[in-house]
UniProtKB/Swiss-Prot annotation:
Full protein name: Large ribosomal subunit protein uL4
Gene behind this protein: RPL4
UniProt keywords, alphabetically: Ribonucleoprotein, Ribosomal protein
Any Pfam family hit: Ribosomal_L4
UniProt keyword Chloroplast present: no
Amino acid sequence: MAAAAAAARPLVTVQSLEGDMATDQTQTVALPDVMKASIRPDIVTFVHSNISKNSRQPYAVSKKAGHQTSAESWGTGRAVSRIPRVPGGGTHRAGQGAFGNMCRGGRMFAPTKIWRRWHRKINVNQKRYAVVSAIAASAVPSLVLARGHKIETVPELPLVVSDSIEGVEETSAALKVLKQIGAYSDAEKAKDSHSIRPGKGKMRNRRYINRKGPLIVYGTEGAKLVKAFRNIPGIDIINVERLNLLKLAPGGHLGRFVVWTKSAFEKLDSIYGSFDKVSEKKNGYVLPRSKMVNADLARIINSDEVQSVVSPIQEGSKRAPLKKNPLRILNTMLKLNPYAKTARRMSLLAEAERVKAKKEKLDKKRKPISKEEASTIKAAGKAWYQTMISDSDYTEFDNFTKWLGVSQ
């Protein structure tokens, strides 16, 4: 679903830094059309999940794993399973099952192969649409906040900084710049989030995790700010001509906090073009238009232009009645037979009377036993038990066994 573009201001203020030449008038730049493009989270998620697979390294288990023994099945008739077993003796390993995926020391089920389809091809136009959507989403404050960035002290979005930031060489100076433009709190959040990864990933060269901070986009090739910002945790630096969806929407989530330099911001129109003008850098590329300029569908349907060509409502048309089963639907039965409700109620009352009468009849038959009668019954049971034990006690055991003919 295409989301309406929220960044609709005609001009964007360029934030000046300490040491810049003071001017009477505040610098502004025109908002590029790419910031007004439709935002498609479905395309961004699809493209991100596919291009992120292109950096995978093929892996597989050894072809020999689990088969480095001369095990053979014992066959049937040995009262053991027919799984191949290790030959020999004198060791615990002899006679153990081998080869199968259910065996200790056996191979895995369907051993992994390196000829898996690791990489994915994505249409060029689809990749461009995803990047354009990510750029447009970076100018929407609600999406940037929803992604978790700290932008409470940022003057405005999109955030454009003067080109003097490209001359920053030291990391200490870079931190001062972040404080001036209000992006330091987001960088601090990324730094404080540095922690050890939970789970098995910490054993697999993915030991530490940390959140993403601001993305610095510069326009001059070979700018000095790359070395100044590259050592700050969570901050990424990228050239405007090499914008990457993995940096603009990490994890496929829209709304990365982006800091643009003035030169980079001015290049966006030439790189991505506009809704009417073809891009200068991308052959024949024009920004995608939204399917609907106005998302209020009810307003469109009820407009004079649409209503003037819509066919009038047909009057006098007869619709086939919906047939309902009165045996299952009570309201339908009551329309056909109002007495059905009374008949059902009478049957329920009659059933309740029958249950009550049966209970009273059984209660009369079941007379309660007094304590004296209960003790008499218990004593009779004990006497019978003692009689049974005494009758089974054979004193003349030898004569009895001779009579049975049992030899000792």
